[in-house]
Amino acid sequence: MQVKVVSDRVTVVLNGVTTAENVILENACNREIPAYAEGQILLIAGNAPLNVREMYIRELPATPRFELSEEEAADGFEVLFDGTSMHKWTGNTTNYVPVDGTIYVMAQYGGSGNLYTKKEYGDFVLRFEFAFDREGVNNGIGIRTPMGVDAAYHGMEIQVLDHDAPIYKNLRVYQQHGSVYGIIPAKRVKFPPLGTWNVEEIRAVGDRITVTVNGEVILDGDIRQACQGHNVAPDGGKNNPYTVDHKNHPGLFNASGHIGLLGHGAGIKFRNIRIKELPAAKTKK
């Protein structure tokens, strides 16, 4: 038998057969908090004798742990992913794997392939870093979205995309990285080489969404003004002349919802994810 523990994940191999792979290690004493980062190894025997032999251990390098800066801590930010524990997340925890202090995405497109915060957020500032490890990566950040739906329409999707890749040469402007998908196009940003970490901030205050990448504001717009208040077609049809993608976005004006990592394929990793909740802004109607 072999037991491997990395961050908050455990893999068990019994007689050459993997019986558990990258399963979240829960805190048996209190499931509301993550498992401890370190501790003793305990052998537990039930009602039958337990015989163990040839037991040995190899310690692995510690996973980097992210902590808030003094400024962010004083400003009210909260860590959503510290590099080791995903206890603040739910959904597809199988294809979003902690690797060397990052969340590595292996999920494919679809509601069941998404990872969500357990908590819902309304107005907030979300900060994180991301890196593409291959060309043509497509992903997204869902905001104010329910779980298990297409966030681009039933909430909002802030596009995450390697739009410089040749396969996206015919990309529509509202699909560029940082866009509020189908609603407000973002300014096109030039990414550094693959593997380089990018810094992003998403600010959602009422109807105003602001996206900053590597210190540059690439989107600052009002979602209600962008569609003239018509997030769905006035005639009840499927074609909406007021949105740039001409589709209905019934969840566009959600007051709150989950934040989601929207897997459209492998090849992206996230780290240093933190958030600051803001007082609810007054929305013009």
PLM-predicted stretches and their roles:
Residues Q2-K285:
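Carbohydrate-interacting regions of secretory-pathway proteins
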